[in-house]
């Protein structure tokens, strides 16, 4: 029985020492925060998991109507272009802006991730941004316009380059 108490004490001591060492690693500058290097896999996983859990918890808005409305999707394409989303995320027939290549983590390819996101999550990310990723907050933009962007992003994989070009022409 005595050995169980000693084993628990040893486990507790290892946990305390490990926590102090881990905190020291981050707090005293040993962890490299340079954007020129990718994070270690475990850090990238932890950050992505934290990001997704936070977005899922805070994203409570519901679309004001159908996001399948063609007029809403077209308006979203125009807003997507005018607000500069295309610079980091690209668009049908349009590559990322050269300057966005230095962002870490890389801006997501929306065609690939949209199937794994709910509209409420996309809305929250556009409205609030994501800290330490380069994704700015667009909270100053009217919610209706943000929903049009969400509608467009939901269809981005099916929009042709010609459609995007026609839809993203600024209105006079």
Identify the residue ranges that each predicted region occupies.
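Extracytoplasmic/periplasmic copper-protein system
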Residues: 160-172
């Amino acid at each position: 029985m005595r050995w169980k108490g000693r084993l628990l004490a040893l486990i507790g001591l290892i946990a305390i020492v490990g926590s102090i060492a881990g905190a020291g690693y981050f707090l005293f500058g040993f962890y490299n925060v340079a954007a020129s290097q990718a994070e270690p896999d475990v850090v990238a996983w932890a950050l992505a998991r934290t990001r997704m859990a936070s977005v899922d918890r805070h994203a409570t808005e519901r679309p004001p109507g159908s996001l399948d409305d063609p007029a809403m999707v077209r308006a979203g394409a125009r807003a997507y272009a005018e607000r500069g989303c295309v610079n980091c995320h690209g668009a049908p027939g349009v590559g990322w802006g050269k300057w966005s290549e230095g962002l870490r983590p890389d801006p997501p390819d929306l065609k690939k991730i949209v199937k794994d996101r709910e509209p409420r999550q996309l809305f929250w990310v556009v409205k609030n941004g994501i800290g330490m990723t380069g994704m700015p907050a667009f909270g100053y933009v009217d919610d209706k316009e943000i929903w049009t962007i969400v509608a467009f992003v939901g269809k981005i994989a099916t929009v042709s380059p010609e459609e995007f070009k026609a839809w993203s022409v600024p209105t006079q």
